[in-house]
């Protein structure tokens, strides 16, 4: 077994998008596609440091049907998702429609926060607002000082509004953000709701 195979064995990766699609349909999970390259240092760190973290593995296996592709070997999938840099993480629905993506290595703690943010955005794009709210709320409750927190708070307001149609959620979001994250770009965007 090569080093990559040994590292990747900690996570339960599915062997094809079709397998991920079937799992996503039967479990109502989203699909997470990990694009990597053998020559990419960020990919190596993701494999060796991030994916070996038990909290990362538990989150990914609990919330997603995970599949991985090597960009130099799986050129059709790489082209289909317009992967220009690695590592790239793409969240799709069960039909393969891209809902969200992010690029680049993150250590385990920041990776978990990014997963929650991207999962919330993906759920919102899929119009599953309660699931989006839960993902954003995780960041607000567990990582309130993270770089992702203002964006999560902003989109929590959007998800609540889209879920209920109640514009007061937007105004309360602005008020909370203005107190908690003054001067942040996401707070400036929320100022339209004041």
Regions found by a protein language model. Name each.
Residues 7-56:
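Local sequence-structure signature of Cys/Sec-based thiol-disulfide redox active-site neighborhoods
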Residues 79, 112-146, 180:
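Alpha-helical segment of the N-proximal tetratricopeptide repeat
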Residues 17-26, 52-118:
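Thioredoxin-like thiol-disulfide oxidoreductase module
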Residues 129, 166-167:
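TPR-repeat structural position
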Residues 54, 97, 101-107, 139-149, ...:
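Short solvent-exposed coil/turn linkers within tandem alpha-helical repeat scaffolds
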Residues 132, 169-170:
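Single-residue signature of alpha-solenoid repeat helices
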Residues 124, 156-161, 194:
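Specific register positions within alpha-helical solenoid repeats of the TPR/Sel1-like families, i.e.
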């Amino acid at each position: 077994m090569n080093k990559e195979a040994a590292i990747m064995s900690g996570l339960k990766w599915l062997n094809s998008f079709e397998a991920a699609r079937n799992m996503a349909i039967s479990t109502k999970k989203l699909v997470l596609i990990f694009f990597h390259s053998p020559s990419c240092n960020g990919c190596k760190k993701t494999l060796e440091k991030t994916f070996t973290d038990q909290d990362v593995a538990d989150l990914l296996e609990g919330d997603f049907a995970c599949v991985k592709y090597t960009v130099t070997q799986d050129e059709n999938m790489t082209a289909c998702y317009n992967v220009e840099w690695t590592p790239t993480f793409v969240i799709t629905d069960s039909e393969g429609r891209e809902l969200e993506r992010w690029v680049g290595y993150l250590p385990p703690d920041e990776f978990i926060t990014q997963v929650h943010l991207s999962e919330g955005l993906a759920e919102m794009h899929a119009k599953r607002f309660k699931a989006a709210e839960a993902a954003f709320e995780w960041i607000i409750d567990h990582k309130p000082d993270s770089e992702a927190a203002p964006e999560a708070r902003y989109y929590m307001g959007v998800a609540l509004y889209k879920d209920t149609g109640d514009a007061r959620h937007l105004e309360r979001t602005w008020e909370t953000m203005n107190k908690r994250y003054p001067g942040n770009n996401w707070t400036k965007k929320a100022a339209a709701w004041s």
